[in-house]
């Protein structure tokens, strides 16, 4: 007998069961719909909002700019005081001394600790080794410059998806030769391996270029590029092979600029208000190159509609190994696919490691 003397008929039991199943169906279908929507959206899912496990990319851009500037002050101070304390920390891929100076070390210390003190959870890869006891109390004042506020909206991403790449002094060889126009400090932010924020700072002129993918920038591409007879920019340290192959591909009269520093070379493709900045249409590098040398430039080019790829035209991912073994080809305002196709006929598309 049912409680309180209520007798349930078979029909009543059936109705009750159907109602229960209906409630469960709606709850579960709502859950599945949410999961399916998230799957479809993928990376386009809504901003997760502020939280302990997220970072605002606008803030990260601001601290990256500040880090590049602070590092630049150290670089300039050391050079002007002529207290470089130059030494070799190994060999480059071309067999030359891989030089390090006090400028590299002090810039690295400021840049690394500014970012880590502001965002302790983030993974930061840097060219110079950071000792566990080598701390710096430098802190970010949380100030976001007006030009960033005006262009960039708040956007939160998961902290674990971020990898940062720092080059505290790009073009160290030229720095020791007092060819300071080539010198830059650089910061890059990659999300899930893709470069989305880039900062390139020239310490000796005070010029800073920054850009954020799907956001804004402080720099723009030039009004025109020469696709018929492009000017190429290559490294000073191993220009022989690149010049030969480039002229075989594009003609013996092709103009080729030899320059120091990957940051400087990327800026040569853009509209830079600096009388000492050379201009080119295409940047080529045929040997191994470290990711902290190229990540910032890659992010800036991506944000402005340009491309930086391996010599095979493959996307460069900024996770895992610090080494990009595929060489690189960078352009903007050009048909990048055509460049890859032409060069692949002449270049050894698997960038080779030179004999030491």
Curated annotation (Swiss-Prot):
Coiled-coil features, chain-numbered ranges: none
Topology in membrane: Single-pass membrane protein
Main location: membrane
Spans through the membrane: 11-31
UniProt keyword NADP, yes or no: no
Any Pfam family hit: Inositol_P
Chemical reaction(s) catalysed: a myo-inositol phosphate + H2O = myo-inositol + phosphate
Protein's cellular compartments: Membrane
Binding of Mg(2+) 2, residues: 167, 170, 293
Gene Ontology MF annotations: inositol monophosphate phosphatase activity; metal ion binding
Binding site for substrate: 127, 169-172, 293
Alphabetized PROSITE patterns for the sequence: IMP_2 (PS00630)
Pathway this chain belongs to: Polyol metabolism; myo-inositol biosynthesis; myo-inositol from D-glucose 6-phosphate: step 2/2
Keyword entries, A-Z: Hydrolase, Magnesium, Membrane, Metal-binding, Transmembrane, Transmembrane helix
Cofactor entry: Mg(2+)
EC number(s) per entry: 3.1.3.25
Binding annotation for Mg(2+) 1: 127, 167, 169
Family: Belongs to the inositol monophosphatase superfamily.
Protein known as: Inositol monophosphatase 3
Organism whose genome encodes this protein: Xenopus tropicalis
Gene name per UniProt: bpnt2
């Amino acid at each position: 007998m049912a409680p309180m003397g209520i007798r349930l008929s078979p029909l009543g039991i059936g109705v009750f069961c159907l109602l229960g199943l209906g409630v469960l169906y709606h709850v579960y279908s709502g859950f599945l719909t949410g999961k399916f929507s998230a799957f479809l959206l993928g990376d386009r899912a809504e901003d997760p909002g502020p939280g302990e496990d997220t970072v605002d990319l606008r803030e990260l851009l601001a601290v990256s700019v500040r880090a590049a500037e602070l590092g630049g002050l150290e670089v300039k101070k050391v050079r002007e005081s002529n207290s470089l304390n130059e030494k070799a920390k190994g060999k480059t891929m071309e067999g030359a001394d891989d030089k390090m100076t006090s400028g590299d070390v002090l810039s690295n210390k400021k840049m690394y600790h500014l970012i880590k003190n502001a965002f302790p959870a983030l993974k930061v890869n840097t060219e110079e080794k950071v000792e566990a006891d080598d701390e710096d109390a430098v802190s970010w004042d949380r100030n976001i410059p007006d030009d960033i506020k005006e262009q960039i909206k708040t956007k939160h991403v998961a902290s674990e998806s971020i990898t940062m790449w720092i080059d505290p002094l790009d073009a160290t060889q030229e720095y020791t030769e007092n060819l300071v126009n080539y010198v830059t400090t650089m910061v890059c932010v990659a999300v899930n391996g893709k470069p989305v924020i880039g900062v390139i700072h020239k310490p000796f002129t005070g010029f800073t270029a920054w850009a954020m993918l799907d956001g804004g920038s402080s720099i723009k591409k030039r009004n025109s590029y020469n696709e018929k007879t492009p000017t190429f920019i290559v490294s000073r340290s191993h220009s022989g092979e690149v010049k030969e192959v480039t002229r075989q591909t594009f003609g013996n009269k092709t103009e080729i600029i030899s320059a120091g520093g990957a940051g400087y070379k990327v800026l040569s493709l853009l509209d830079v208000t600096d009388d000492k900045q050379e201009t080119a249409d295409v940047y080529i590098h045929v040997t191994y190159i470290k990711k902290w040398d190229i990540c910032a430039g890659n992010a800036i080019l991506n944000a402005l509609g340009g491309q930086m790829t391996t010599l095979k035209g493959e996307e460069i991912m900024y996770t895992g190994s610090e080494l990009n073994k595929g060489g690189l080809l960078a352009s903007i305002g050009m048909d990048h696919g055509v460049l890859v196709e032409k060069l692949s006929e002449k270049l050894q598309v698997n960038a080779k490691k030179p004999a030491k």
